[in-house]
Amino acid sequence: MRKKDQPKLWLCLYLPNLALEVFYPSRAKQMLSDDLKPIAIIQQQRIEALSYHAAATGLTVGTMASHAYALCETLICIEKSASKEHRALEQIAQWLYEFTPNVSRYGDQHLILEVSSSLKLFSGLNHLKHLIEEKITHLGYTPKIGVSQTPLAAKISAEIDCPDNHQQSPGVALKALQLIHLQLPSPSVTKLEKMGITILKQLIELPRHTLKKRFGETFIHYLERLLGAVSYTHLTLPTTPYV
């Protein structure tokens, strides 16, 4: 009898402070500490990211820059640079080829690595994660890592600091996760909550045809990608270096 194929293992590298750190990568930790002037990254005159000290003043993401200056006279505003962020992700992806040939960009702050075949070479998942975190921190960036059996579950795990439950399927590992953390459309979450559905376990227990009728094909496809029922076609794993 053939042994059942082992599921692939995906590691998501999330860089929540990338918009700030691309300007001062070698001073990232200092810049985010509370002993420097408050710094905000703005786009179209709205705050998109805040340093630690800026956030401590009560400023929030989405605040208009003009209003922010009134609340914090010492605020330093820097225009967002999508090109710097893109180049930084490209550079980081190149460095990550040290650990796996399967590296892909996943949005503006994430990189996805398929690490199933890397575990033995790097003495297990914990050691591999440590090496990646050490490498990225040394480069001047603040990493958060999530690991799961699907790219989407790994991404969500990284963003919410979910413990590694990679030996379980996402439907089991994330079963207690609140719907608000699944990155579903807000109207869908509101409608589900009115039905008494607030966590992933309750959601996946509902008949698929009922969900499709109420929320549409796109909703079902997203849920199946999260759970691993279908492959994630939007994620391309290059066979040549990330450029």
Each PLM stretch: what is its role?
Residues H234-V243:
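Single conserved hydrophobic/aromatic residue that forms the stacking wall/gate
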Residues K144-K155, V172, H181-L184:
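Extended compositionally biased segments used for macromolecular assembly or nucleic-acid engagement
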Residues W10-C12, A28, C72-L75, V189, ...:
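DNA-contacting surface of Y-family translesion DNA polymerases
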Residues S118-S123, P163-N165:
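Short, charged/polar, Gly/Pro-enriched secondary-structure boundary elements
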